[in-house]
Amino acid sequence: MTIYEIKSYLSRPYAEAAFKFANENNIVDDWIYMIEEICKILKNIKIYSLSSFILKKNKNFLFESIKNNFDVYFNNFVKIIIENNRLIIFPEILNQFINLKNDQNNIENITIISKYKLDKKILNKIEKKIKSLIFKEIKINIKIDKSIIGGYIIKSKNFLIDNSIKNKLYRFSEYL
């Protein structure tokens, strides 16, 4: 199991519980904002990377320093995560929470990776094709990666289309 898979596995129950509560109370966007704020705080202090080794008094200090910024329900959520030594997975909780919201709203996040910035016409063609295949609204995130040599990679949580030259060379080398 990769680190990403472990974080994903550990964060899923927290994200699902948080989303269920936020959804039932019509405060999903508020919770996204609060989780984003916690992620920013943790990124700035970088202490969470050793979350299981942080002394209890430091965890309490961290919680006391942030609790006035959030409502009581979110504070309870944060407290549970701190007590279970899971601060390190907060960014993944955010990702999964957003994915749950998008699933509910029938939206698919798509990442398109290419060596160069893609032309608008090409992006529109890709968007139309994907929409016709998955019957969902899509949000496109574009990343530039010079290592793919050429072509593009289209991925979401449900599929991967690797049309990169790097992948084609790799597959060709397997035949040799």
From Swiss-Prot:
Domain of life: Bacteria
Cystine pairs: none
GO CC terms, sorted: plasma membrane; proton-transporting ATP synthase complex
SUPFAM superfamilies: N-terminal domain of the delta subunit of the F1F0-ATP synthase
GO MF entries: proton-transporting ATP synthase activity, rotational mechanism
Any matching Pfam family: OSCP
Entry membrane topology: Peripheral membrane protein
Compartment annotation: Cell membrane
Keywords: ATP synthesis, Cell membrane, CF(1), Hydrogen ion transport, Ion transport, Membrane, Transport
The UniProt record lists the keyword Membrane: yes
PANTHER family (UniProt xref): ATP SYNTHASE DELTA CHAIN
Family: Belongs to the ATPase delta chain family.
Function per UniProt: F(1)F(0) ATP synthase produces ATP from ADP in the presence of a proton or sodium gradient. F-type ATPases consist of two structural domains, F(1) containing the extramembraneous catalytic core and F(0) containing the membrane proton channel, linked together by a central stalk and a peripheral stalk. During catalysis, ATP synthesis in the catalytic domain of F(1) is coupled via a rotary mechanism of the central stalk subunits to proton translocation. This protein is part of the stalk that links CF(0) to CF(1). It either transmits conformational changes from CF(0) to CF(1) or is implicated in proton conduction.
Assembly description: F-type ATPases have 2 components, F(1) - the catalytic core - and F(0) - the membrane proton channel. F(1) has five subunits: alpha(3), beta(3), gamma(1), delta(1), epsilon(1). F(0) has three main subunits: a(1), b(2) and c(10-14). The alpha and beta chains form an alternating ring which encloses part of the gamma chain. F(1) is attached to F(0) by a central stalk formed by the gamma and epsilon chains, while a peripheral stalk is formed by the delta and b chains.
Protein name, per record: ATP synthase subunit delta
Lineage: Bacteria, Pseudomonadati, Pseudomonadota, Gammaproteobacteria, Enterobacterales
Gene expressing this chain: atpH
